[in-house]
Amino acid sequence: MTLNKLYFDGGEEIRDLTIVGGGPTGIFAAFQCGMNNISCRIIESMPQLGGQLAALYPEKHIYDVAGFPEVPAAGLVESLWKQTERYNPEVILGETVTRYRKLDDGSFEVTVSSGKVFLSRALLIAAGLGAFSPRKLPQLNNIDDLEGRSVFYAVKNISDFVGQRVVIVGGGDSALDWTVGLLNAAAEVTLVHRMHEFQGHGKTAREVLEAKESGRVNVFLNTEVRSVDREGEVLTAVHLRSKSGKSRRIEADRLLLLIGFKSDLGPLAGWDLELADNALVVDSHMKTSVDGLYAAGDIAYYPGKLKIIQTGLSDAAMAVRNSLTYIKPGEKIRHMFSSLKGAKEKRNAPDNG
């Protein structure tokens, strides 16, 4: 018997918890469900698990997750799933949750974009920042057909930039990270930022400036991209203009626009839940303004919230733990240390030898 069948009332359609969002927070929430012996399903709008890490930054390295001095985004997602998959959570990909309804018995019904309906005893929103789309430069209105060929908004495959003359636009962490990350792959790297100083991590900013001093990267501050040159479907150059009015033409094969993403709560915004800072307000138990409906990760707001992966994982653990009293009212909730549970699972595992 799998954990997905422990608390069913007879049908296999209902789960104890539906998790909306399959990023790191959502995956770890599913792991916590397994640790707490409740069934769950993950509903993810993208065609794969991992959220923005998988969709936008699979080759980006992350440095602020406890226990990992350095880990590629795709590697972190893979590790989280490896940790979780032994509990066999139901996973539904490529479906967006469009509405929810709390039923008279306190359970929840969610409807997805295809019209399918899923039932669960509680609901956890772990949808990150909601739907996201890259910020674009309004003055570049002739590059849509170059996107994915010569113009990019994220680095999904470093091979797209190997041996190419790359112009990177931005001054935050992503722009700085990939300026450093592409130095040994690209034929030439140029970083353009419209402000007079970088907004990204100080250590990476120093690496960029050191690379500039050694002639490995071109850096233009107080400068904007004004237009591009192209030959058919091929980018050939980028035109820059500084705030002082100086113009410059940079020959380029790739334009990498790393100026952030616009987030949109989408259907969540109309769910009649309390909002603050474009997120769902939660209490100390990660519960929203609706009893039985929880939120975790970037989509959850509480005073002092720090939007990093580590916090999302902690949110997920608290949300699942606190949902138990709603899912199984009247039952005494006992905490089991992971070391003890792991040992118990090993003892109960079938002997394949």
UniProtKB/Swiss-Prot annotation:
Subunit and partners: Homodimer.
Free-text comment on the cofactor: Binds 1 FAD per subunit.
Superkingdom, taxonomy of origin: Bacteria
Keywords annotated in UniProt: FAD, Flavoprotein, NADP, Oxidoreductase
Residues where FAD binds: 25, 44, 52, 57, 97, 132, 298, 339
Listed GO MF terms: ferredoxin-NADP+ reductase activity; flavin adenine dinucleotide binding; NADP binding
InterPro entries attached to this UniProt entry: FAD/NAD-bd_sf (IPR036188), FAD/NAD-binding_dom (IPR023753), Fd--NADP_Rdtase_type_2 (IPR022890), Ferredoxin-NADP_redctase_2 (IPR050097)
EC number(s) from the headed UniProt entry: 1.18.1.2
Pfam family for this entry, one: Pyr_redox_2
Protein name, as recorded: Ferredoxin--NADP reductase
Catalytic activity: 2 reduced [2Fe-2S]-[ferredoxin] + NADP(+) + H(+) = 2 oxidized [2Fe-2S]-[ferredoxin] + NADPH
EC category name: oxidoreductase
Required co-factors: FAD
Family: Belongs to the ferredoxin--NADP reductase type 2 family.
